[in-house]
Amino acid sequence: MWAHVVRHFEQFLGELELKDPERLDAEGKAERIAKSLFSKYYPNLAFNPSSYVKVGSYGKGTATRPRTDLDMLFIVPWDVYTRIDALTGNKQSQLLQEVRRTLLVTFPNTEISADGQAVVAPFQTYNVDIVPAFRFTTGELAGQYMIADTTDGGRWRFSNPVAEYNWLRQVDVASAGKATHLIKMLKAWKRECNVDIKSISLEILVSVFVTQWEYRHQTIFYYDWMIRDFFAFIMNYVNGWTRPAGITEQILLGNCWESKCRTAYDRALKACDYEQADDGFAASCEWQKIFGSQFHLDWIHSLLMARVGA
């Protein structure tokens, strides 16, 4: 029984893994952007790689193929905040526009835009979201960042990507990497089934789930059950809230994703039954309905069964 589970999920996770050229491409773009902004905001200093931080899925190691947007914070000096905060009107928008104009000098042929919390540079292979940020180094907020939000007339918000990263790493250490693996697989579900739920919310829910899942210390042999059990778990959070690590702001989950989650759970139930019965092809068909073509159909098992039947 369950003869195909390990092979199925090892292959699936391999398909989701970014390739080295993709990682190098992302890192190269982030560094070019950082160098452009560094020369603007630190004109008398040699470039310092610690002036920017990759955040989001790339920063936390949960990025998957196909490539997604790269999010980065660029650390802006506090004297810039003093200057911007003294302006009238939407101060946050003016900061983003200043960053945009700076990047246009380096990337004149790129249609760079600024809105919300980020300046967006849509390169051919990656969209890079650049968030100018002011870093707190002392006091209660040490380690956190203040970022601009241009919506509703503009305001300053707080972000703590280090706390998010550390929390995920702690869960991974306690579960042999299951949190990161599950997040990557669920991103494939989100993309394939067009699920209306924020990736950050999925990451938070995965961390909560994995810390209490009874099989968290087991191997990849249990990943079919992990998928099934997570979809059952998340149904308890319909219209609930999640809160990113390190900040007090909460994110409303809503219920737009409920129907697709129930469908995924039903398909996972079938897939688990097929896995137990060693029907690798039927199981892979159900998994593919959830995750898309990156979960390959198990033609090997199908051909072997046909050969046995012959």
Describe each region flagged by the PLM:
Residues Q94, A114-G116, T125, G139, ...:
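Short, well-structured alpha-helical interface segments that form or flank functional binding sites
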Residues T82-S93, A133-I147, F221-A232:
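Helical (often loop-to-helix) elements that flank the catalytic cores of nucleotide-handling enzymes
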Residues V131-K178:
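Acidic/Ser/Thr-rich, low-complexity mid-to-C-terminal regulatory regions of eukaryotic proteins
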Residues K178-I290, Q294-H296, G309:
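Conserved nucleotidyltransferase catalytic core and NTase-mimicking acidic/glycine-rich helix/loop elements
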Residues M1-V53, S57-R67, W78-N90:
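N-terminal regions immediately upstream of nucleotidyltransferase
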Residues H4, H8, L24, L37, ...:
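Conserved catalytic core of two-metal-ion nucleotidyltransferases
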Residues L73-I75:
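Short hydrophobic/aromatic beta-strand micro-patches
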